[in-house]
Amino acid sequence: PELFKSYFIVFKDYNFGRYMLTSTIVSLGTVIITLIFAIPAAYAVARLNFFGKNFLSTSILIIYLFPAIVLVIPLYTIFSQLGLRNSIEGLLIVYTATTLPVAIYMLQGYFKSIPKELEEAGIIDGQNWLGIIFKIILPLSLPAISSVALYVFMIAWNEFLFSLMF
């Protein structure tokens, strides 16, 4: 029908499907890499006691205060020297670095809301720390992890400045 003619032209003549696939790969890759790093970091900041914990906790969001345009020239220079311009790997690095602070911040708030008594019950039941994280904390955190995953996907999908520069 005439109604969908423009869509057929865009996908057929302008290779739009390939661009959509690339955007999907980059966005999903960013989500996966960000969650791999954000979950242990947020758990550490929320639960473990270490020197500089408060400073680290507050500085996570301070990083997010810098506008992206300030980072473009230094990153462009570094990525040119490393040969990461015009590559999916380069975008994954930049997108992960820009979404990691907000992912850690969101997850640490949720991890703090989980009662410590559940972890203590896991220790009594014979679980080690990895067992506690994988069998108690992560299943209880699935709503927060899904929210963070959707938010990171949205940020990566809508980001244009870095994809234009790199």
Where are these regions (language model features)?
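A structural signal for multi-pass alpha-helical bundles of membrane permease subunits
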Residues: 1-166
